[in-house]
Every structure is written in structure tokens, then in C-alpha cells.
Amino acid sequence: MFKTTLCALLITASCSTFAAPQQINDIVHRTITPLIEQQKIPGMAVAVIYQGKPYYFTWGYADIAKKQPVTQQTLFELGSVSKTFTGVLGGDAIARGEIKLSDPTTKYWPELTAKQWNGITLLHLATYTAGGLPLQVPDEVKSSSDLLRFYQNWQPAWAPGTQRLYANSSIGLFGALAVKPSGLSFEQAMQTRVFQPLKLNHTWINVPPAEEKNYAWGYREGKAVHVSPGALDAEAYGVKSTIEDMARWVQSNLKPLDINEKTLQQGIQLAQSRYWQTGDMYQGLGWEMLDWPVNPDSIINGSDNKIALAARPVKAITPPTPAVRASWVHKTGATGGFGSYVAFIPEKELGIVMLANKNYPNPARVDAAWQILNALQ
């Protein structure tokens, strides 16, 4: 019964030239409510950007014990969706002339003297193609000297630029090195160059005391959790944000030419440029892209950790292809207690943000997002 109703509704919406707010509301609720029930998600916020305008939806609790509901001001941990901010901040540094993706890593960290670092560039770090850096920086890395020792001792499995292996230790180091010429800390650079110009006034790396009341608890095996500190966490998975700010983030990425700051405008475009291809996926800086129209099986199955975290051969795109408006641009993210997903289609001025205080399987997120955006495109 439910499937039949949903399919009919999707077909109706797809055929209309303009979806009224009530249609958007129906499509979102008919897709997300069963997802919340199936995945036992305590609280969720969704934004749909349709014809450039945001529509907001919230469900459940940010804090179960206090029965505090999710609102448009609730802060969620973004997990790896943070990498899209790191990619854009790196793009902004390129636009300012502070760094080049072709620069060797050692230019920005001369202490990195081990011979395996010869030939590894900032591009390799930003796009997980350095040769097999691990998914996580080890927990025992606490200090800058520990971090140097970790990278000095790392041994690549492949030559740089031949395989993509998704890694926090790769893009995290890119983020840390990309801001070095500015003289700013990573957090300062992100605040002044990305968050503030885009008026992301409730987006944080470190949640300030005044905002803690809005910071949702994540839930893992029934226990309330927040992300633990770790080396390069800010750069790889450390951003917390609201559904309103994340809708604004998608709007900015949909239409970068509307942004006044030229280097940020260029940074967004550079983050959506295509540097490598693996299968039908193109790797940007933080963002991942597929050609639109897209095969839903590609994005849904490709998001499964068995595929997303596996080593895959890459083909270099030289020179990189500038941002393609006919693209499905997306990124998944998770921490121990949160699961997020962002996807948008620039050509359609259409996008979605899904923030939840439970880490649930990526394919379920992508499937729901696809159903909603496909119905509205």
C-alpha cells in the first residue's frame, strides 16, 4: 500500500513543472518517516532546496532524556561532510595564490623528510590518492611530534596518483597544510574565510558554551555520545552545524557566482572540479560527483562502506574538468552517534541535507535523498 502511494506521488510530482510546498511536504514525509522508523533514528532534520529556496522539516528528539525536540537550531555533528568545508577552504587558499595543488607536501612541512614523501603533492592528499594513507590517524597520536612520527613511518602501498583509498589522514593533512601560509589556525581560517562570509553563524568546529544548549546528543547502542577529540579531527570530521546553516551551505555550492568574495567563489568551484575518475564517480576537493542524469544504483551502492572505503584505481583528469552543472554532487558523513548526507544538482537548483543523531547505513540515506530529489527534478 505504502509503496504504491509513494510511487504514484513521485510520478505526479516529477511530471509537474512546479511542486507546491504541500507536495514537497508530502514527498519528504512519505520518504523520511518510514526511514526514521526502520532505522530507529531518535531525531532528524531535513532541508530540501527547491528552485533555490529552502524547506525545513524536523522529527524527534535532540536529547531523549530531556525530551528536547529537534529544531531548525539544533546542532548536529556532520562527520565527513566536514570534508566539503575543508575542500572549499583549500580552494580558497588556491584562489588567493597561497598554495597550489601541484606543490609537494614537503614544501609546507619540511620536517617530512622520509623518502616515500617524494612526489606526493597537496592534490594527492586532498583526493585520497597519496598511495594508501589509512582511514584514521591512530588514537595514540596526541602531539605534533607524534603526528610527524606517524607520517614519517607510514609506508605507501602504491605509487601516488594510482589508487584512491578514502582516508581522514589524507584530507586531514591537506587541510592542516593548506592554511599554513595564511598564518591562521585551521579553525580561524575556516571561520573568517568560509563560515563568516557565507553567514553560517551557527556552524562550529568547537561548539561555544552559549550554543551547547542546542547541541544534540548522538545515540549509539542506546547511549548518548559526542565525538571524541582526535588528531586532524577539525580538518576531517569536526564540523557541527544546524539544518538552516547547511541549507545555506548547499545554496552557496549550488550558485557560487552569487557569493561576493571572489576567492571563496573560486574555492567552491575548485572543490567541485573533477581531478580523478574511478568508475562513474569523479573526485573533487571534499565533494564527489557523478554525471547527471545519474543511475540511482550507482550512487546508492557506491555509498556502501564496502565500496566507498575500498581501494580503487583512478584515472587522472588532466587538466581537471571545471565544475559541471549537470552533476549529482554529494557527500556522506558520520561520527559514532550521528549520520549526515548532502546532495545537490546545480543544473536543477535542487538539493537536500539530511542530519540525524544516529549513524545509520549510507545506502539508506542516499536512497531516501534520491527518491525526494528525483520526484522534484
Curated annotation (Swiss-Prot):
Arranged from A to Z, the UniProt key words for this protein are: Antibiotic resistance, Hydrolase, Periplasm, Signal
Effect of substituting residue 166 to E? Lowers activity more than 1000-fold
Q: What is the annotated signal peptide range for this record?
A: 1-19
Q: What does the record give as the reaction this protein catalyses?
A: a beta-lactam + H2O = a substituted beta-amino acid
**Activity regulation, short description:** Inhibited by the beta-lactamase-blocking agents avibactam, enmetazobactam, relebactam, nacubactam, vaborbactam, taniborbactam, zidebactam, and beta-lactam-analog boronic acids, via a covalent binding to Ser-80. Inhibited by non-beta-lactam, benzo(b)thiophene-2-boronic acid (BZBTH2B) and various cyclic boronates. Not inhibited by clavulanic acid. Inhibited by O-aryloxycarbonyl hydroxamates, via cross-linking of the active site Ser-80 to Lys-331. Weakly inhibited by citric acid.
Compartments in which it is found: Periplasm
Misc. remarks from the entry: The class C beta-lactamase family has a specific amino-acid numbering system known as SANC, for structural alignment-based numbering of class C beta-lactamases, or else the simpler name structural position. A multiple sequence alignment was used to derive a consensus sequence and then the consensus was numbered taking into account insertions and deletions. This allows use of identical numbers, e.g. for active site residues, despite differences in protein length.
* Name of this chain's protein: Beta-lactamase
Gene that codes for this?
Answer: ampC
